[in-house]
Curated annotation (Swiss-Prot):
Lineage start: Bacteria, Bacillati, Bacillota, Bacilli, Lactobacillales
Family recorded in the similarity comment: Belongs to the RNase HII family.
The protein, known as: Ribonuclease HII
Keywords recorded for this protein, A-Z: Cytoplasm, Endonuclease, Hydrolase, Manganese, Metal-binding, Nuclease
HAMAP family for this protein: RNase_HII_B
Cellular component terms (Gene Ontology): cytoplasm; ribonuclease H2 complex
PANTHER family cross-referenced by the UniProt entry: RIBONUCLEASE H2 SUBUNIT A, RIBONUCLEASE HII
Sites where the protein binds a divalent metal cation: 74-75, 165
Catalytic activity reported: Endonucleolytic cleavage to 5'-phosphomonoester
Record organism: Lacticaseibacillus casei (strain BL23)
Gene this chain is encoded by: rnhB
InterPro entries (alphabetical): RNase_HII, RNase_HII/HIII, RNase_HII/HIII_dom, RNaseH-like_sf, RNaseH_sf
Cofactor note: Manganese or magnesium. Binds 1 divalent metal ion per monomer in the absence of substrate. May bind a second metal ion after substrate binding.
Gene Ontology molecular function, alphabetical: manganese ion binding; RNA binding; RNA-DNA hybrid ribonuclease activity
UniProt keyword annotation of Transferase present: no
Length: 252
């Protein structure tokens, strides 16, 4: 009879023989029952993730019948008082299997785990940035459009079609706009993760350059700590002067 440690090693394999599972089921040891239960939970979780991934790739699978290269686009940072809007365009391979989802539904740790896998396995990734001066000059919506067009232009493989989270990208390509696209498309979800990780890291860098605003935690959003910093220290070069609280501080 295998030891529990041997069973544990066998259950960690990519494929587990039915005879192993049958033997575990017949094993009267409490530890054997726990190992089997844990394995079954992992299998159920994996099956659920596969179903969810298939659901979130339904738009890609529809388009892949016509287009080889479909890019998903998303933005991060339209609402903050400071920092840029960051956009990403991602073309995924048809066999992509990582459980990407709306970046807002993931923890920072989960995003940081998925981020390198997206960069490594994607066919192409493009980044666009609209800084606070562009946002103040163009308005936030148009600045985001420009950053999305920039992200498409930075793809090393030209996309044939775009999936976009509820916006129009000013480029001459077929595009489908999806409401809550980052929760309904793996390509948009991957783009949201890439954009979020890049912007968060940028704001953490700005926190060191401009201490006193808590950028490392609020990422430029108008939190109590950020507003207190704005009142105490004034407006930094990365603040959006067209946004109400910043504009009010400039007038005070």
């Amino acid at each position: 009879m295998p030891t529990l440690s041997e069973y544990k090693a066998l259950l960690a394999a990519d494929e587990v023989a039915p005879t192993i599972l049958a033997a575990l089921k017949e094993d009267s040891r409490i530890g054997a029952g726990k190992l089997l239960a844990a394995y079954q939970r992992r299998q159920a979780h994996q099956a659920a993730e596969e179903v969810a991934l298939r659901y979130r790739s339904r738009y890609e699978r529809q388009l892949w019948g016509t287009y080889e290269y479909v890019a998903g686009l998303d933005e991060v940072g339209r609402g903050p008082l400071a920092g840029p809007v960051v956009t990403a365009a991602v073309i995924l391979p048809h066999h992509f299997q990582w459980p990407v989802n709306d970046s807002k539904q993931l923890t920072a740790h989960e995003r940081n785990v998925l981020y390198p896998h997206i960069l490594t396995e994607a066919i192409a990734v493009g980044i666009g940035v609209a800084d606070n001066r562009t946002i103040d000059r163009e308005n936030i919506y148009h600045a985001t459009e420009l950053a999305m067009a920039q992200a498409v232009d930075h793809l090393r493989v030209a996309p044939e079609c775009l999936l976009v989270d509820a916006m129009h990208v000013p480029v001459d390509l077929p595009q489908k706009r999806l409401i809550k696209g980052d929760a309904n498309s793996i390509s948009i979800a991957a783009a949201s993760i890439v954009a979020k990780v890049i912007r968060d890291r940028l704001m953490m860098m700005y926190d060191k350059i401009y201490p006193g605003y808590d950028f490392k935690d609020n990422m430029g959003y108008g939190t109590k700590a950020h507003l207190a910093g704005l009142a105490a220290h004034g407006v930094t070069p990365i603040h959006r002067r067209s946004f109400g609280p910043v504009r009010d501080r400039l007038r005070s």
